[in-house]
Amino acid sequence: MKIAILEDYQDAVRHLPCFALLDGHEVDVFTEPLDDEAMAERLAQHEAVVLIRERTCMTAALMDRLPLLRLISQTGKVSGNVDMAAAQQRGVTVLEGVGDPTAPAELSWALLMAAYRRLPQYVSQLQGGHWQRVSDEAVHDTIGRALKGDVLGIWGYGKIGQRMARYARAFDMEVLVWGRAPSLELARADGHRMATSKAAFFAAADVVTLHLRLNDATRGIVTAEDLAGMKSTALMLNTSRAELIETGALKAALQQGRPGFAALDVFEQEPLNTNDPWLHMPNVVATPHLGYVEQKGYELYFSAALRNVLDFVARDKAS
């Protein structure tokens, strides 16, 4: 089978132990983002594509231009990046893999700590020859602070949110939870405090961290009004999906000083270009969507996705 692995930015997949599962198949690994025109041209002879999370959108229009496509193998769970109805109509099988909260939760906590202690700014200044300086501008040259005693506001008490709560307890933070009723009840059973309202949640939290799935109900669920209700010293942490926040609202809120800071691993347009304002805001720590990007997680995700390809081939031969 001719197989394409798409948007492997770091050319990491071919170096994983599980890549050997595809021995005997013709495999092309594409490391650069491709627009629909380029994908239609380069994938015209491929029967299967392996997607890395939501990096690639498989639309009806694109599938129409891939006459040999028979299988889409998704690392992790299938999300809105695949038009499932279009795939079914065109006889394209879509198989999903497994997920794990460990890597995204750890990345979230690392970002939180880096932002709180201003680590990226200190490192940048140190490399420029400046000792114990955060910024060349006095207004931004503020020291960081410890987590102990601060309030971690968790919106979405699923697997990642629960890990964040455990990390917070280890650092002597107070946990405040907001979300749907089942989520709140689970958090209450774990001994955490519930916010009485969304407004109270944003007002009380020193850090707001979002751990929600993106769908029609959650798109833009964090509004400009919510952000304006945060403390001027507060941090907005988003490692889930940029579209959970009303378009343009967070940039405007940061410029107006509420919240005072943001730590972001996700953006509406990815990859970011070097001129993107997010990369030049002194009160923002930005990482290039690394939540699930680490060796153990990749091996887990791709082992499942590549085994799905092999299972598909085996079923096809048996039929």
Task: Give residue ranges: language-model regions.
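A conserved FAD-binding loop/helix module that cradles the flavin
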Residues: 293-304
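Rossmann-like adenosine-cofactor binding region
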Residues: 41-44, 57-62, 181-277
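N-terminal Rossmann-fold NAD(P) dinucleotide-binding loop
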Residues: 161-162
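An N-terminal-biased, well-structured beta-alpha scaffold segment characteristic
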Residues: 1-98, 223
